[in-house]
Each structure stands twice: as structure tokens, then as C-alpha cells.
Amino acid sequence: MNMHDFSKTKILVVGDVMLDQYWSGRAGRISPEAPVPVVKVADENVRAGGAANVALNIADLGADVNLMGVIGQDSFGQQLNQVLEQAGVASNWVYSESGTICKLRVLSHHQQLIRMDFENAVPELSAKSLAKLVAEKVADYDVLVISDYAKGALQFVEEMIQAAKSQQVPVLIDPKGNDFSRYAGATLVKPNQGEFELIVGVCADQDDLIEKAKQLIQEINIDALLVTRSEHGMALIEKDAGATILKSRAQEVFDVTGAGDTVIATLATAFGSGLSMPKSVKLANEAASIVVRKVGTSTVSKVELEEQLNASMRHQGYASMSEDEVHSLVQIAQSKGEKVVFTNGCFDLLHSGHVRYLNEAARQGDRLVVAVNSDESVKLLKGDSRPIVELAGRMELLSALSCVDWVVPFNEETPERLICKLAPDVLVKGGDYKPDEIAGAQCVWDKGGEVAVLSFWEGYSTTRMVDKIQEAEIKEGAAQ
């Protein structure tokens, strides 16, 4: 999957904003006043919550984001503004006497002991002013994200949706409550399974969920539903397409606080950049698997997401990695100071000589890219009887090696064009070549890189293996 450049994507986030405070420390004894633990507070920090956390997630992915909501001219509001300014999030507020919502959590040993909420109802006049502000600005954005926490800022959400639709701006909604009809006309609504079943009733199984989702889409006149299902992954159901079911990618779950914010933020950023809805959902699923490994309200950066995609591709055998995808991963590695090594070959009938060579190549740096000749390229080099193993199989075998980070195919006789594009730090070739005879060497040198020649291990050859197999078949035929 390609990671788009999100820097030109403009997203407007509107909804219930709040400040999340965290006090943490050691709980070493029980209070003599009541049967509750005493926490000796050692650390205090504040984070943006609710719709503000959605905006932070979008900013961390590199998109241009503006946040609109209702806050108070109070200390909580001041702290929230500081967090947003540090993250580069622009904001337009409706100020209200109801104040800024704050949720204070007390933790010990990463376990939440208690949460205290500071909040008042948002006045209707403030909510009306917010809807008017959205209508005035929404045309300037690629996507409108509505983050509903049922705190009162979205009393006129219908007007916001209609304003966006009139400007052909997609509307993605993270919902709340048991009345989804107020979201009529939205592009997508993203409930979790509990919120979804509150509307449609308990789902007996996955097929039942899909059927009920299709019915709800028709009833409330939206284009799609994305049902997040915790450890069961996600289900995307579109009006004019089939269902897309994604398994959960999370291996460890420490805290689900704000995970829904990350999902809607990643989905909106990807969709706003031009990706299809299914591809955007896949990206959001990867982001969710990252954020649940963090404690408290957190975000996922573009670098973290790209690294997660890298791990996902490795798990899947790299069957669909493109040059652009590998190029992106190489750039990320180099930006972190990692030395990227490049080598190439046909790798037909992978043998221990190949494995030893690749291990030695990997030791020349931190990351190893292996470029593999396509089937057509192998035929040009080896003749019509080759390859023995098709490209997909050769790539899968190579990707299973722990020394190999990324595998990418090429169609030409040499990988010179690919080398010039990827710009590795070290170019490695096996055999008795002189460095200046190696395809792509000049490109690497021009960019300050190194070229290394490694020895092949004697006695290992795919051609020799093929000859032995043919000899064995001849002998077996003669014996019969």
C-alpha cells in the first residue's frame, strides 16, 4: 500500500472538544479515611481530547487541519490551546460561559483508578454559532470530520452536513447516541459495535451485522458504515459495493482511550488525499493497532504508520510491494540515520549459498533491499527454460529471511534504473566484478554511497542444482 503525501490535504474537524488531564504516581497504601488507594502524584500531563484529539492525529499524519468547537475562556481552555499550538493545529472557537470540558484521570502502574469530569451543557446559542461557522468555512476543505461525544456542541449537526454536501465536501462522522437519523446525508458514519447494536439490535454473527448495516444505510440515507469491532477488526459496508472485512492488527492492547479518534482521523486523511474508501479503512486499521499499544489519549505519526505498513507487508510476504512503496520506506530509514543496502539477483531455486550471501550483504548496513528479476527478465538472462520458480514464489521465499527487509521486482536486464531511484547507501554485488562494472554503481557514488563486491560461496549454484535434478531424472528413466 502506498503512503500518499498528505501535506496538501485540508481537513476540517468539528465537534465536542475537551482537555484530558492525567495524574500518575505510585499507589502504595490504603487511605485511613476510606477504603481507597492513596496515589502519590509524581507526574501530571495534559492532552487534547475528543474532537481535539482527532485534529492532533490528523496533524501528526502531516495534513493541514483546522479545528472548530465550543470552549470557555478558562484555564482548561488555555491549556488546550497550548497543546494545539504546539502541535501546529489551527483552531476557530465559539467561546461559551459553559466552559471547557475537562476529564481528569488518576493512574497508577498504568492502570486508571478514577476519572473526574468537569463539564456543563453547551448552550443552544453557542451550538448554533458553531454550525454557522462551519457553513461559512467548509468549502475550503477536502473533508469534514464530525466528532460527536454528545456534549452539546453538535445540536445542529444536520445543518453542518447539508452545508458540506452543498459544496461537495465528503462528511465522515464518529457518532454518539441512539439516533443516527440526524446524520442523514453523510458520506460515512463510524460507530463501534456497541453503538451500532444500540441502533439495530444484537448481531448474531458477521453476516447478520452486514445485513443490518445495509438496512441502516438505506434508512438514514448515508453512503457507508464503518463498524469498528475491537479485537474482531472492522467491517466497511458501502451502499454501492460489497462489504470489506478487516481483521484486527493489534497484538498488544494497553489502552483503547482515543482509539476511535485515531481511526476517524486516519480514515479522513487518507480519503481526503485521494485514496479509495476501502484503502483508507485499511490504513485506519493499521493506525488503530498502533495507538492501542499506547497509554492514554495518543496520536499516530506518519512515520509510525509507515513502519507499521512495513511490518504488515513483511508479514504478508511482500507480494504487492511496488517501487514507490519501497522508495518511501528507504527514505524513512535514511531519515533516521539507518544505512540502506541494496542487492539484486534472480534467486531462482533459493539455496544456502544465496542465504549466506544475503546475510553477508545485510551486515553491510541496517536495512537490506533485495531486487528480484521478473520472470521476463530471468528469461532474457537465463533462457526460456527459466525461471523454475515464478516471481511471486521467489519474492515470498526471500521475504521470509530475517536478514531481508524489503523485496521489490524489476523488469529490465539490470536494476540500474531502480538503484538510481532508491539511492541506497551501499550497493552490493556478488561475484568477481570490479566495482565500476556493476550496474548502478555510478548513481550510488554520485550520491555519496559505497559499492561493495562480495564473494560467492563455492559449490552453490542454481544451474548446478538444475543439472543434478536432470541427471537424476535421466538415471531414473534409464533404470526403468
UniProtKB/Swiss-Prot annotation:
E.C. number: 2.7.1.167, 2.7.7.70
Pathway: Nucleotide-sugar biosynthesis; ADP-L-glycero-beta-D-manno-heptose biosynthesis; ADP-L-glycero-beta-D-manno-heptose from D-glycero-beta-D-manno-heptose 7-phosphate: step 1/4; Nucleotide-sugar biosynthesis; ADP-L-glycero-beta-D-manno-heptose biosynthesis; ADP-L-glycero-beta-D-manno-heptose from D-glycero-beta-D-manno-heptose 7-phosphate: step 3/4
Listed GO MF terms: ATP binding; heptose 7-phosphate kinase activity; heptose-1-phosphate adenylyltransferase activity; phosphotransferase activity, alcohol group as acceptor
Stretches the record annotates as Cytidylyltransferase: 342-480
GO CC terms in record: cytosol
Residues at the active site: D261
UniProt KW Kinase keyword: yes
Annotated region described as Ribokinase, given as residue ranges: 1-316
GO BP: ADP-L-glycero-beta-D-manno-heptose biosynthetic process
Catalysed reactions, as listed in the record: D-glycero-beta-D-manno-heptose 7-phosphate + ATP = D-glycero-beta-D-manno-heptose 1,7-bisphosphate + ADP + H(+); D-glycero-beta-D-manno-heptose 1-phosphate + ATP + H(+) = ADP-D-glycero-beta-D-manno-heptose + diphosphate
Keyword Transferase: yes
Residues that, per the record, bind ATP: N192, Q193, G194, E195
InterPro entries referenced in this protein's UniProt entry, alphabetically: Bifunc_HldE, Carboh/pur_kinase_PfkB_CS, Cyt_trans-like, PfkB_dom, RfaE_dom_I, RfaE_dom_II, Ribokinase-like, Rossmann-like_a/b/a_fold
Keywords: ATP-binding, Carbohydrate metabolism, Kinase, Multifunctional enzyme, Nucleotide-binding, Nucleotidyltransferase, Transferase
Pfam families listed in its UniProt record: CTP_transf_like, PfkB
Coiled coil: none
SUPFAM superfamilies, sorted: Nucleotidylyl transferase, Ribokinase-like
UniProt signal peptide: none
Function: Catalyzes the ADP transfer from ATP to D-glycero-beta-D-manno-heptose 1-phosphate, yielding ADP-D-glycero-beta-D-manno-heptose.
Subunit-level organization: Homodimer.
Family under the similarity heading: In the N-terminal section; belongs to the carbohydrate kinase PfkB family.
UniProt protein name: Bifunctional protein HldE
Gene transcribed to yield this protein: hldE
